[in-house]
Amino acid sequence: MDIAAAREIGAGIAVIALAGVGIGLGNIFSTLVSSIARNPAARPHVFGLGMLGFALTEAVALYALLIAFLILFV
């Protein structure tokens, strides 16, 4: 196995984290929608927490892509 193949395999393994991010984002927003549907008065507080969860979960995706690009191109 040459170095180019090892880099591509390593980058593919690093991007596996994106599957978890997709599941996490779906869970965050489904819970957000159902909690707002149950108690519309709590929308400002719940929406802020949902956006914080979205940002933190999306940061994991950006870190995974960064690591994959570092493996491929550095």
Swiss-Prot record:
It comes from the Bacteria. Keywords: ATP synthesis, Cell inner membrane, Cell membrane, CF(0), Hydrogen ion transport, Ion transport, Lipid-binding, Membrane, Transmembrane, Transmembrane helix, Transport. It is found in: Cell inner membrane. InterPro entries: ATP_synth_F0_csu (IPR000454), ATP_synth_F0_csu_DDCD_BS (IPR020537), ATP_synth_F0_csu_sf (IPR038662), ATPase_proteolipid_c-like_dom (IPR002379), F/V-ATP_Csub_sf (IPR035921). It is a multi-pass membrane protein. The record marks 58 as: Reversibly protonated during proton transport. GO terms for molecular function: lipid binding; proton-transporting ATP synthase activity, rotational mechanism. One of its GO terms (cellular component) is proton-transporting two-sector ATPase complex, proton-transporting domain. The chain crosses the membrane at residues 9-29, 54-74. Pfam families: ATP-synt_C. F-type ATPases have 2 components, F(1) - the catalytic core - and F(0) - the membrane proton channel. F(1) has five subunits: alpha(3), beta(3), gamma(1), delta(1), epsilon(1). F(0) has three main subunits: a(1), b(2) and c(10-14). The alpha and beta chains form an alternating ring which encloses part of the gamma chain. F(1) is attached to F(0) by a central stalk formed by the gamma and epsilon chains, while a peripheral stalk is formed by the delta and b chains. F(1)F(0) ATP synthase produces ATP from ADP in the presence of a proton or sodium gradient. F-type ATPases consist of two structural domains, F(1) containing the extramembraneous catalytic core and F(0) containing the membrane proton channel, linked together by a central stalk and a peripheral stalk. During catalysis, ATP synthesis in the catalytic domain of F(1) is coupled via a rotary mechanism of the central stalk subunits to proton translocation. Key component of the F(0) channel; it plays a direct role in translocation across the membrane. A homomeric c-ring of between 10-14 subunits forms the central stalk rotor element with the F(1) delta and epsilon subunits. Belongs to the ATPase C chain family. PANTHER family: ATP SYNTHASE LIPID-BINDING PROTEIN, MITOCHONDRIAL, ATPASE PROTEIN 9. This is ATP synthase subunit c. It comes from Gluconacetobacter diazotrophicus (strain ATCC 49037 / DSM 5601 / CCUG 37298 / CIP 103539 / LMG 7603 / PAl5).
